[in-house]
From Swiss-Prot:
It catalyses: N-acetyl-alpha-D-galactosaminyl-di-trans,octa-cis-undecaprenyl diphosphate + UDP-N-acetyl-alpha-D-galactosamine = alpha-D-GalNAc-(1->3)-alpha-D-GalNAc-di-trans,octa-cis-undecaprenyl diphosphate + UDP + H(+). It comes from the Bacteria. InterPro entries: Glyco_trans_1, Glyco_trans_4-like_N. Involved in the assembly of the O-repeating unit during O-antigen biosynthesis. Belongs to the glycosyltransferase group 1 family. Glycosyltransferase 4 subfamily. SUPFAM superfamilies: UDP-Glycosyltransferase/glycogen phosphorylase. Its EC number is 2.4.1.306. This is O-antigen biosynthesis glycosyltransferase WbnH. PANTHER family: GLYCOSYLTRANSFERASE. O86:H2 and O86:B7 subtypes share the same O unit, but the O units are polymerized from different terminal sugars in different glycosidic linkages. Keywords: Glycosyltransferase, Lipopolysaccharide biosynthesis, Transferase. It is an enzyme of class 2 (transferase).
Length: 338
């Protein structure tokens, strides 16, 4: 069997890590899978991997010693395909191709060179453009990411394959009594904006907000909303599947590819309220609304969904099978194993 490696900067719960875990489980019967990351965490404890390698230097923008450690792992384990799923990991995965031969796949989960670049955005985009020359496949998870790759970064179209993210079927929401429970699931770091949603709901006592996720902003957010009885922080939850216990899923963020938590909520058949960024629009088909990242628009759209809730829930039920992973399995395997 082939030996396939996944390299991701961090191993804590997040969209890229969830993606690595789901894809690994999908292909595990057809190849040996290895994980390379910078730290122990949620992902390294999964039993799907034949080997797990921790290289702390992957967190750094560039380090020669890290590059040679990666080369050694690839050669000693005869890894023929390496899939990078985060920005820093993507830099090392492409540069190590100068030292060893393998099939290199880079997965964009929102193009951090655009949303994290700041004043250096143009430089990071140039770097990403030239790194693409060392990449066999640029895997875009949404049409929005594909468009940005071509128009904003300048990546050549033949390098790009666009296949949507997808997730296992979540437990579906049945006809339960409406409780006006709103759910946010995401890592509490940039570019997520849970504070906008919390500010809105703190002023609307008819709703309750339940925030699932850890991250560097968790404690400061808990302190900020400590006196709000309808704002609840559940912290980091391993293997969260309980979307069906809530009435609405909302993800407010400054940037997304095609968010894994949004996909999970979609398959659970609950209405969605999502920021109009990245590929989020691909999840909305009458089953929810897109918002600008302002409190006024979030509040207005939140009320609009609950005022016509049965219609949005009916559309959510109809759409819930679209992003189930079994529908995309052959396409994923073709990219990785083909």
């Amino acid at each position: 069997m082939k030996n396939v490696g996944f390299i991701v900067t961090k191993s804590e719960i997040g969209g890229a890590q969830t993606w690595v875990n789901e894809i690994s489980n999908l292909i595990k019967e057809e190849c040996n899978i290895f994980l390379i990351t910078s730290e122990e965490g949620w992902l390294t404890h999964k039993d799907v991997f034949a080997g797990v390698f921790v290289i702390p230097g992957i967190k750094k923008y560039f380090d020669f010693l890290t590059l040679f450690k990666l080369r050694k792992i690839l050669k000693e384990n005869n890894i023929s395909t390496l899939i990078a799923s985060s920005a820093n990991a993507g830099v090392y995965a492409r540069l190590v191709r100068l030292l060893v031969d393998f099939k290199c796949i880079y997965v964009s989960h929102g193009w951090s060179c655009l949303y994290n670049g700041g004043r250096l955005k143009s430089i990071f985009c140039i770097v990403e453009k030239y790194l693409s020359l060392l990449t066999d496949v640029i895997w875009c998870v949404s049409k929005s990411d594909e468009k940005k790759a071509i128009e904003n970064i300048g990546i050549k179209e033949p390098k790009i394959i666009t296949v949507s993210n997808s997730v296992p079927q979540m437990p579906r929401c049945n006809n339960k009594q409406l409780q006006y429970k709103v759910l946010f699931v995401g890592r509490l770091t940039h570019p997520k904006r849970p504070e906008l949603l919390a500010n809105v709901i703190s002023k609307k006592p008819q709703y309750s907000l339940h925030i699932v996720g850890g991250g560097e902003r968790l404690e400061s957010l808990k302190k900020q909303f400590s006196e709000c009885e309808n704002i609840h922080f559940l912290g980091e939850v391993n293997n969260f599947y309980n979307y069906h216990e809530y009435d609405l899923f909302s993800l407010i963020s400054d940037s997304e590819g095609l968010p894994m938590s949004g996909l999970e909520a979609h398959t659970a058949a609950i209405p969605l309220l999502l920021s109009d960024v990245g590929g989020c629009f691909e999840l909305i088909e009458g089953n929810g609304l897109l918002v600008e990242n302002t409190e006024d628009d979030i509040g207005y759209k939140l009320d609009k969904i609950f005022d016509d809730y049965e219609n949005y829930r009916e559309q959510a039920i109809r759409a819930s099978g679209k992003f189930v992973i079994e529908n995309y399995a052959s396409a994923y395997k073709s990219i990785i194993l083909g």
